[in-house]
Amino acid sequence: MGVGWQDPAIIRETGVCVWRSSERPELDFKRNGDFLKGHMALLYTDIPHDTPGNANNLRDYDLIERAGAAAREAVFESSISKLGAAISLSYAAQLKEGMRELPQAEGCVGFKYCGGGWGGYALYLFSARAERDAFVESANCNRAIEPYITIR
């Protein structure tokens, strides 16, 4: 399936979906995403990238598995702090693959590249709405996002 297979699922589903890795990804569980409201932002990195060109790079699958297990637990518990730690583990795996460091943000509990990484967008998770909103106001390339979308 390559990288980024989950992106269409995000558009079709509302809430937070936790996937199990296998031959074909399987939905483990889905829950509403209310606990994420006011905590997330995107940063546009303006870094050109070729995601398919990086699909066969070496990866630390043990670290990726630990990040996934930590994220699953965090979503199950609705824990922003645990989810931030899981996102930070995923980012550590991205750095080991050679991705560029992302800028720090005050009040951010975790950040990482979205999708297959290497550029494009990065997700920033904040402990409080005020910190998220300050981050969004700090640059034109930052946008607040919420766990639900409206398709018109």
Label each region the model flagged.
Residues G2, Q6-G116, L123-R152:
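C-terminal nucleotide
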